[in-house]
Amino acid sequence: MKVRASVKKICDNCRLIRRRKRIMVVCSNPKHKQRQG
């Protein structure tokens, strides 16, 4: 899980979702997991 100020889709499988008022990226590739810090 990467914590970043700006979250972006890295590949086509990445999905932007909102969870508990946080923007997150979920993907089939675990390296692409991000959340906004």
UniProtKB/Swiss-Prot annotation:
It comes from the Eukaryota. Its main location: plastid. The keyword Ribosomal protein applies. GO terms for biological process: translation. Coiled coil: none annotated. GO terms for cellular component: chloroplast; ribonucleoprotein complex; ribosome. The keyword Plastid applies. Keywords: Chloroplast, Plastid, Ribonucleoprotein, Ribosomal protein. GO terms for molecular function: structural constituent of ribosome. It is found in: Plastid, Chloroplast. Belongs to the bacterial ribosomal protein bL36 family. This is Large ribosomal subunit protein bL36c. It comes from Physcomitrium patens (Spreading-leaved earth moss).
